[in-house]
């Protein structure tokens, strides 16, 4: 899936920003979180997050649910490289495994399990 953030900001600018963030906040992970285009779930109010390295994927999902004011009975799925990451995984390990060449971790979310298997 194409990232709107990548389309709107040149590579050099993204890379410099991620490097600056990592230098200033070594214990935080720069994350870009965007909605899967065709999903009917609410659009998030901000795309950029500085996530504590020891946060789990499940805790990050909770943050996203709160930001889009998603009711408890509604499902939300997050994807990293079009794959559902394990809920108990630390964001730091997901970052090390899947960070983009610009230094950001790109996460997409959807109300449907649109990629792969659970």
From Swiss-Prot:
The record marks 116-117 as: Cleavage. Keywords: Autophagy, Cytoplasmic vesicle, Lipoprotein, Membrane, Protein transport, Transport, Ubl conjugation pathway, Vacuole. It is a lipid-anchor. This is Autophagy-related protein 8. Ubiquitin-like modifier involved in autophagosome formation. With atg4, mediates the delivery of the autophagosomes to the vacuole via the microtubule cytoskeleton. Required for selective autophagic degradation of the nucleus (nucleophagy) as well as for mitophagy which contributes to regulate mitochondrial quantity and quality by eliminating the mitochondria to a basal level to fulfill cellular energy requirements and preventing excess ROS production. Participates also in membrane fusion events that take place in the early secretory pathway. It is found in: Cytoplasmic vesicle, Autophagosome membrane; Vacuole membrane; Preautophagosomal structure membrane. Residues 117-118 form a propeptide. Transmembrane segments: none annotated. SUPFAM superfamilies: Ubiquitin-like. The C-terminal 2 residues are removed by ATG4 to expose Gly-116 at the C-terminus. The C-terminal Gly is then amidated with phosphatidylethanolamine by an activating system similar to that for ubiquitin. It comes from the Eukaryota. InterPro entries: Atg8-like, Ubiquitin-like_domsf. GO terms for cellular component: autophagosome membrane; cytoplasmic vesicle; fungal-type vacuole membrane; phagophore assembly site membrane. GO terms for molecular function: phosphatidylethanolamine binding.
């Amino acid at each position: 899936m194409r990232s709107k953030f990548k389309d709107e900001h040149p590579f050099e600018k993204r890379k410099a920003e991620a490097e600056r963030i990592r230098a200033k906040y070594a214990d935080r992970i720069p994350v870009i979180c965007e909605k899967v285009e065709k999903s009917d779930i609410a659009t998030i109010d901000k795309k950029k997050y500085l996530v504590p390295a020891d946060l789990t994927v499940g805790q990050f999902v909770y943050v996203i649910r709160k930001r889009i004011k998603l009711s408890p009975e509604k499902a939300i799925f997050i994807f990293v490289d079009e794959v559902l990451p394990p809920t108990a995984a630390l964001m730091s390990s997901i970052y090390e495994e899947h960070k983009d060449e610009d230094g950001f971790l790109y996460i997409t979310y959807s109300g449907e399990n649109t990629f792969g298997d659970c």
